[in-house]
UniProtKB/Swiss-Prot annotation:
It is found in: Secreted, Extracellular space, Extracellular matrix. GO terms for molecular function: cytokine activity; frizzled binding. This is Protein Wnt-4. Disulfide bonds join 69-100, 85-95.
Length: 119
C-alpha cells in the first residue's frame, strides 16, 4: 500500500533520585582492593581475603578517603571543629553528622532587629 512505519528508540536516564540511591548503595558496599600481578596480568583483589571477589557491577577503591572530621592540611582537609551546625537537621549540616559524634556546644543568641511593622 506504499505506507511505512518509522520506529525511533533512544536510551534515557532514570530519574536523578533513583541514580543517586543506586550509587549510594554501591558506595556503602564498596570493597577496598589492591593490585596484584598474576603472571603478566594485573588484577584487583579484595584487600581483606575474607571478602568475596568483586563483580563488574561492584564499586571498588584502592585508597581510603581521608577523615574529613579531623584537620589534615597534607590532604587539604580543614576538619569540622569550630564550624556552625544546625541542631535540628539530620542532613550534612546537622550537628550529629558534622561533628563526627564528638559532641557539640550550643549557644543561644537573641537577635534584635528593626522591622517595618505597621500597627
Amino acid at each position: 500500500s506504499g505506507s511505512c512505519e518509522v520506529k525511533t528508540c533512544w536510551k534515557a536516564m532514570p530519574p536523578f533520585r533513583k541514580v543517586g540511591n543506586v550509587l549510594k548503595e554501591k558506595f556503602d558496599g564498596a570493597t577496598e582492593v589492591e593490585q596484584r600481578k598474576i603472571g603478566s596480568t594485573k588484577v584487583l583483589v579484595p584487600k581483606n581475603s575474607q571478602f568475596k571477589p568483586h563483580t563488574d557491577e561492584d564499586l571498588v577503591y584502592l585508597d581510603s578517603s581521608p577523615d574529613f572530621c579531623d584537620h589534615d592540611l597534607k590532604n587539604g582537609v580543614l576538619g569540622t571543629s569550630g564550624r556552625h551546625c544546625n541542631k535540628t537537621s539530620k542532613a550534612i549540616d546537622g550537628c550529629e553528622l558534622m561533628c563526627c559524634g564528638r559532641g557539640f556546644h550550643t549557644d543561644e543568641v537573641e537577635v534584635v532587629e528593626r522591622c517595618s511593622c505597621k500597627f
